[in-house]
């Protein structure tokens, strides 16, 4: 049995190695693979591109955590464990890192589509099996490990806030951040891009628009939270402006476009006079 397990790990290791040879493993610390499960090879494609932040939507369906955006019935065998947790665990077992030589956690964002409390209780049960690779909270202390799980969507704030130990954190609402006196519950803050600004990158951004955006990001950073905006224009000019404001994560479904963006130097976006 032990020999078989070791053989499986070797096969996985060489599979990852062969796959990663095709693309240099530069870790894209600011890239966020939105709706990652829609790619041909969920998780693996993102890892191939060096993405350090990955999202999966889940439904609690027949006591399983099914990865899907809608209609989990048609994807009932595509579970969070099979597509994400088990492969990450096996990859770490092979090389002691998710990315060789990269000693920071990657983020696995789990967007909960069903009841917050019921789904979290099942998620908690599943995460226990992989606790050796998961960042943990234990009586006021955070211990970073290879993978940090962050819950978005339907979030069980009260349930998680009462826990003395857990292996998940919360993605806060950037526009209405919760008071987190311990700074140990919410490690991120997100909002829909259009709820912050309407700028699409096709014309100069006003100074006031940019200041407003930068202020949201600055406020989150003072509370120790990484910032992500979703449904952002897929325009490198907008992305560059967001990076100039100090945003932590660029949100996109397009892995190639993100890698290309982070590989190039960009001219500063135009800024119009205040309106």
Kindly give the residue locations of the regions a language model identified:
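Phosphate-group recognition and catalysis centered on beta-loop-alpha active-site segments
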Residues: 23-275
């Amino acid at each position: 049995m032990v020999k078989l397990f070791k053989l499986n790990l070797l096969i996985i290791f060489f599979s990852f190695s062969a796959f990663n040879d095709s693309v240099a493993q530069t870790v894209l610390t600011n890239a966020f693979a939105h709706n990652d499960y829609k790619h041909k090879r969920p998780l693996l494609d993102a890892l191939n591109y060096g993405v350090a932040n990955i999202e999966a939507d889940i439904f609690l369906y027949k006591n399983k955590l099914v990865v899907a955006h809608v209609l989990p019935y048609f994807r009932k065998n595509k579970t969070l464990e099979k597509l994400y947790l088990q492969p990450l665990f096996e990859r770490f077992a092979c090389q002691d890192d998710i990315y060789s030589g990269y000693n920071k956690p990657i983020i696995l964002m789990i967007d909960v589509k069903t009841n917050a409390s019921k789904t979290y209780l099942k998620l908690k049960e599943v995460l226990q099996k992989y606790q050796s690779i998961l960042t943990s909270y234990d009586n006021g202390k955070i211990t970073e490990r290879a993978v940090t799980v962050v819950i978005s969507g339907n979030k069980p704030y009260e349930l998680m806030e009462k826990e003395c130990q857990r292996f998940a954190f919360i993605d806060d609402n950037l526009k209405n951040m919760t008071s987190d006196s311990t700074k140990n519950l919410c490690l991120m803050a997100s909002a829909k891009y259009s709820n912050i600004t309407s700028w699409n990158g096709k014309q100069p951004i006003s100074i006031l628009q940019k200041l407003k955006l930068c202020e949201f990001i600055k406020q989150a950073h003072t509370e120790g939270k990484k910032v992500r905006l979703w449904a952002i224009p897929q325009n490198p000019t907008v992305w560059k402006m967001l990076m100039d404001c100090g945003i932590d994560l660029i949100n996109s479904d397009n892995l190639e476009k993100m890698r290309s963006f982070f590989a190039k130097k960009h001219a500063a976006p135009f800024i119009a006079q205040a309106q």
